[in-house]
Design a protein with these regions (language model features):
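Bacterial Sec-dependent N-terminal signal peptides
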Residues: 1-24, 196, 200
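Hydrophobic, lipid-facing positions within transmembrane beta-strands of outer-membrane proteins
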Residues: 24, 36-40, 80-84, 136-140, ...
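Solvent-exposed loop/turn segments connecting transmembrane beta-strands
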Residues: 25-41, 59, 93
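Extracellular/periplasm-exposed beta-strand and loop segments of Gram-negative cell-envelope proteins
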Residues: 29, 56-81, 108-135, 163-191
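Outer-envelope beta-barrel architecture signal
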Residues: 5, 22-26, 48-52, 93-99, ...
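Membrane-embedded beta-strand positions of outer-membrane beta-barrel proteins
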Residues: 26-30, 42, 54-56, 84-86, ...
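Transmembrane beta-strands of outer-membrane beta-barrel pores
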Residues: 30-34, 56-62, 88, 103-109, ...
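Outer-membrane beta-barrel "beta-signal"
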Residues: 89, 186-201
């Protein structure tokens, strides 16, 4: 499954790069950095009005609570996600307002944390368990990019949409045998960017 996703993304990137001789941008989403998730994105111009963005992020960290306490547990927010987006620019590419159509796919291993509006986040149930699974979906976004120089810009965007989540449930944040499995439908915010943009050409 992962191999197929990587191959598909690679083909899309190759097509996008071949489709333009204008600009290629390398980006880092500072909003994603704020939740301690390293990320990068390549965005390719496809003519005068369209670009194709390819954000990916990966978090493999475990945030330990006080190991000396009897109720010691682990808080983890491990996941990876790919979120490609086709953008339409009202002015020129990489300048001003844009609308985006994005998809997303990823994998998670989350424990000891509440995620609003997702899964079983009722009466603090979710933070007492661990969840492993996959998610996929898509949405729409709107954003704006300020040109800082010939080589850099600053981008802001917000998006909302849908995600289908398939998960296994475990009894504690750290260990245990699977006790349940489920599916969830999420509708709400799916994208937020505060990105520094660097142009290769």
């Amino acid at each position: 499954m992962i191999r197929k996703i990587v191959i598909t993304i690679g083909l899309v990137l190759t097509i996008g790069l071949a489709a333009t001789a204008q600009r290629v941008a390398l980006k880092n989403n500072l909003a994603y950095d704020a939740i301690l998730t390293p990320n990068l994105s390549l965005e390719f111009a496809m003519g005068n009005k369209f670009t194709f963005d390819t954000q990916v992020g990966w978090n493999a960290f475990i945030f330990n609570l006080d190991a000396g306490k009897p109720n010691y547990s682990e808080t983890k927010w491990a996941h990876w996600m790919a979120q490609p987006e086709l953008r339409y620019w009202f002015c020129d590419v990489f300048n001003g307002w844009f609308l985006g159509l994005h998809g997303h796919v990823g994998q998670m291993n989350v424990g000891g944390i509440d995620i609003p509006f997702v899964l079983e986040n009722k009466n603090s149930i979710m933070k007492d368990h661990r969840y492993e699974g996959w998610f996929y979906g898509g949405g729409l976004s709107v954003g704006y990019q300020w040109v800082l120089s010939t080589r850099s810009s600053l981008e802001f965007s917000l998006g909302a949409g849908y995600a289908r989540i398939l998960y296994d449930k475990f009894p504690c944040q750290r260990c245990g045998t699977k006790i349940d499995e489920g599916k969830a439908n999420y509708v709400g915010p799916t994208k937020a960017t505060i990105s520094y943009v660097f142009f290769f050409k």
